[in-house]
């Protein structure tokens, strides 16, 4: 018989450990019907006992993780695997967790032209079995943000330039001449905008039967109105410029928009939202966060 060192008595009178397991395990995962090349962290706690073994049997957890590759990930499947973790270490553990990270690739349509392209959304799916079972889903959504203050300053410059070019003729200008001026000189200053990120971290409703990844992304992109594009023709770029002009946002505005949407989402029991505007004006980022736990929030 081969020696089993892990099953020998540990040092320190069997001191308990809050988490023991493996990180960065490669697994092919199906999330929302899409394949994801995932990195998985999996582990359990180790209870204190005078007769406690030195460590856990990681191979048991590793083999059980293969069940996650046999079909689409659901809350029920995650709970089943976590329960199997505890059964595999009966009497030595009463807590288990799984964390799955990867990029979800989605095909997204252009704003105006009849084209589609692929966009990656980073996500982290976490499941814990302690006194109760909980699932959290965190997704990153890239979008564009145009600064309202910069837009106002740009309009002010345009107004000054208009007055300078036309002086006392303003009241008598033909519409066609104004239109020509707007085309050629109507934008002497442009507001600054930047690629931005919304990180939406939700705790799923316990009654959820599936992972609402697509709904989460769609809710966020509709609320923000300026989702980063994939394939872009000129008509799409113009539509994107219009969308940015109609959705001027400070980071505070973006956070509040998302707050309003996810408070009403039936699949969401609580959330932690972080928005990050990667400023083109500054060498630092503008960030806002909002938490909601069902009855109160802290901004």
UniProtKB/Swiss-Prot annotation:
Q: Which UniProt keywords apply?
A: Hydrolase, Plasmid
Q: Does the keyword Metal-binding apply?
A: no
Q: What is its EC number?
A: 3.5.4.16
Main EC class of this protein?
hydrolase
Q: Which GO terms describe its biological process?
A: tetrahydrofolate biosynthetic process
Q: Name the Gene Ontology molecular function terms of this record.
A: GTP cyclohydrolase I activity
The protein's annotated pathway: Cofactor biosynthesis; 7,8-dihydroneopterin triphosphate biosynthesis; 7,8-dihydroneopterin triphosphate from GTP: step 1/1
Task: Site May be catalytically important: give positions.
Answer: 147
Cite the InterPro entries for this sequence. Answer: GTP_cyclohydrolase_FolE2, GTP_cyclohydrolase_FolE2/MptA
Q: Which reaction does it catalyse?
A: GTP + H2O = 7,8-dihydroneopterin 3'-triphosphate + formate + H(+)
The entry assigns this protein to a family as follows:
Belongs to the GTP cyclohydrolase IV family.
Q: Its biological function?
A: Converts GTP to 7,8-dihydroneopterin triphosphate.
What is this protein's record name?
GTP cyclohydrolase FolE2
- Source organism of this protein record: Klebsiella pneumoniae
């Amino acid at each position: 018989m081969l020696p089993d060192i892990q099953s020998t008595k540990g040092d320190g009178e069997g001191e308990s450990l809050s988490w023991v397991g493996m990180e960065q395990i490669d697994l092919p995962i199906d999330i929302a019907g899409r394949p994801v090349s995932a990195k998985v962290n999996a582990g359990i706690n180790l209870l204190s006992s005078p007769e406690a073994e030195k460590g856990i049997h990681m191979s048991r957890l590793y083999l059980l993780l293969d069940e996650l590759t046999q079909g689409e990930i659901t809350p029920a499947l995650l709970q089943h695997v976590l329960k199997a973790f505890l059964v595999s270490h009966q009497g030595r553990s009463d807590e288990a967790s799984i964390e799955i990270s990867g990029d979800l690739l989605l095909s997204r349509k252009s704003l105006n032209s009849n084209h589609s392209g692929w966009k990656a959304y980073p996500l982290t799916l976490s499941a814990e079995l302690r006194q109760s079972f909980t699932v959290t889903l965190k997704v990153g959504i890239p979008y564009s943000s145009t600064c309202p203050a910069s837009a106002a300053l740009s309009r002010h410059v345009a107004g000054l330039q208009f007055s300078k070019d036309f002086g006392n003729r303003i009241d008598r200008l033909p519409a066609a001449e104004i239109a020509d001026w707007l085309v050629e000189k109507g934008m002497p200053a442009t507001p600054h905008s930047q690629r931005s990120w919304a990180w939406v971290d939700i705790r799923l409703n316990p009654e959820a039967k599936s992972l609402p990844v697509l709904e989460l992304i769609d809710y966020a992109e509709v609320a923000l109105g300026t989702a980063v594009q994939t394939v872009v023709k000129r008509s799409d770029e113009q539509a994107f410029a219009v969308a940015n002009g109609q959705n001027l946002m400070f980071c505070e505005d973006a956070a509040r928009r998302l707050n309003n949407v996810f408070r009403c989402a039936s699949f969401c029991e609580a959330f932690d939202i972080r928005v990050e505007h990667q400023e083109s004006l500054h060498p630092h980022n503008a960030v806002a966060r909002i938490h909601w736990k069902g009855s109160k929030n802290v901004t």
